[in-house]
Amino acid sequence: MSKFVVKPTNSLSGCLKVPGDKSISHRSIMLGSLANGVTKISGFLEGEDTLSTLKAFQDMGVKIEYNGDNVTIYGVGLNGLKKPLTPLDLGNSGTSIRLISGILAAQKFDSELCGDESLSKRPMGRVINPLTKMGAMIESNNGKLPLKIKGGQALNGIHYDLLVASAQVKSCVLLAGLYAKGETCIKELAPTRDHTERMLKGFGYKIDVNKNKICLIGGTQLNAFAIQVPSDISSAAFFMVAASIAPKADITLTGVNINPTRIGVIDILKLMGANLSLSNEREIGGELLADIRIQSEQLKGIRIPEELVSLAIDELPVIFIAASCAKGETILTDAKELRVKESDRIQVMADGLSILGIKNEVLEDGIKIQGGVFSKPGIVIESHHDHRISMSFAIASLRCQYIIEIEDVDNVKTSFPNFVELANQIGMNINLVNS
């Protein structure tokens, strides 16, 4: 087990390109495998989660070649997957397990999905229920992993109102809908990332999006195309906050995905007074990209608009760090989904902020954070095996007077394998220590 030992620094500068978007990397493997023809991917995120997806489709008979961030997939078509010889172990990846369950629900063969200890605690009823309504047969461990999916079931399209704002559930049902008889429609509670919808269009699949309603009709084939994966805004967010809170900072992040369903973190930081600007905006493969420049600025506490929560759900832990450095109080509500991520991110972040000396009040669906000073020596933070917790508290070191130690950081490799390298490149001082 490894830990971060982070020494305080006060000046950041440079230009970075963070790794490829995790959500898009997952979906490119899945849809490329189900397409007819050869899909070539550049900018693929070589993290543990995305490699779990890649290996799962290799285990189902798909020929996939990869060299760093370049991947070539020889698609087998919608009905070309083969029964895996063993249960598919998706490690820590909730995206993999939930989206792949939608695909496997329609296959002719039986299958089983499992994951690590953390993933095995996360709720799967949210995908089991709509898939069962479509005609799937799925056994679970009281709504948790492992999932045993019975093959040979004929699926029927459904009209389904999402009970949680979840792109994973939405995508699971849409992927099952590719195989279903008739129309499948999803109605969203709130906007969530729309990479599945955009990529289906890229593969030539007709999908209708009308505000919060997404519909498709099963039975059409997917056709391969080239995919260029933009940099992940969830990874870029750590450096956006870093530059905002550092005493002196001026950094630029290049080629970052600014899909409208992902820019909640930008909107929130701007509301807090961040000195943040976008340039060189362009569109590649149906996704919007931009270069983002961030300079240090005194932030102010805000009430985070509830309509931005689902658009920044993965970035909220590092926004907590921004809030702890802001002048005044920041209030977050309507973020109950944070409690069922890799950890209970509301409680775990609150505990860590308390260790740093920051006053906070935990709410059922959020938190109140009073900006302050990180003044305590001998700080040791437990990450609870959650990559975003580890990286968020590493960023907090920029406002600390003393060394911070963050325990159990191996999980950073799931989403941002070169985080330490890039952080140190712009002036941070993070040592990865095997403990």
From Swiss-Prot:
EC number(s) from the headed UniProt entry: 2.5.1.19
PANTHER family documented for this protein: AROM/DEHYDROQUINATE SYNTHASE, PENTAFUNCTIONAL AROM POLYPEPTIDE
Active site, UniProt feature: 314
Cited InterPro entries: Enolpyruvate_Tfrase_dom (IPR001986), Enolpyruvate_Tfrase_sf (IPR036968), EPSP_synthase (IPR006264), EPSP_synthase_CS (IPR023193), RNA3'P_cycl/enolpyr_Trfase_a/b (IPR013792)
Domain of life: Bacteria
Protein's name in the database: 3-phosphoshikimate 1-carboxyvinyltransferase
Residues engaged in binding 3-phosphoshikimate: 22-23, 27, 166, 168, 314, 341
Pfam families found in the cross-reference section: EPSP_synthase (PF00275)
Keyword rRNA processing tagged: no
Organism: Ruthia magnifica subsp. Calyptogena magnifica
Catalytic activity: 3-phosphoshikimate + phosphoenolpyruvate = 5-O-(1-carboxyvinyl)-3-phosphoshikimate + phosphate
Family affiliation: Belongs to the EPSP synthase family.
HAMAP family: EPSP_synth (MF_00210)
